[in-house]
Amino acid sequence: MNNFIALEKKIKRTIFLGTSCIYPKFAKNPIKEEYLLTGKLEKTNQSYAIAKIAGIKLCEALYEDDNLDIVCLMPTNIYGTNDNFDKFNGHVIPAMISKFLSAKRKKLRSINLLGTGKPIREFLHASDLAKSIIMSLKFPKKKLSK
């Protein structure tokens, strides 16, 4: 909806935040833009991913049809203040921090981390994402890459 408002009000540039979960569940690392729509999505967040993909496609159409200057950013796994720090179902970094702090308080010598440790993930602090959004507003307009 904000993209339509941007078009109507002649906003110079607007930002659309995507998500790394738009890429196929078994996409090769490092993930590349061209992997979009090349395989099945992770089932647990499929609806969210499809909504984000629809948003990206809308942005592409507004860019091509109406010359609206839109930057689509695909942040990786974000962590930071006010995140989900639950030890059992929180986001990866905050959950690990909670487990480490709890183990330190209890003077434990080891902790149990979930998963196999095999997935490769990238993480970005929320404040760094904010800086990158501001920085992306300042870049000169470039042709949409496909």
Task: Give the ranges of each region predicted by the language model.
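Hydrophobic positions on the long internal alpha-helix
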Residues: M1-A6, L58-C59, S132, S136
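Glycine-rich, phosphate-binding/catalytic loops in enzymes
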Residues: P30-E34, N89-H91, A130
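Alpha-helical substrate-binding/gating segment
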Residues: E64, I78, I93-I111, R121-K146
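Active-site Tyr-X1-5-Lys
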Residues: K25-A27, E34, E42-T76, A95-K107
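A structural signal for short coil/turn segments at secondary-structure junctions
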Residues: E8-K10, D66, P140
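Conserved Rossmann-fold NAD(P)-dependent oxidoreductase catalytic core, especially the SDR/UDP-sugar
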Residues: M1-N45, V71
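Structural signature of the Rossmann-like NAD(P)-dependent dehydrogenase/reductase core
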Residues: T14-G18, V71-N77, N112-G115, E122
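Glycine-rich "substrate-gating" loop/helix at the edge of Rossmann-like oxidoreductase active sites
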Residues: T44-Y48, T76-H91, G115-S127
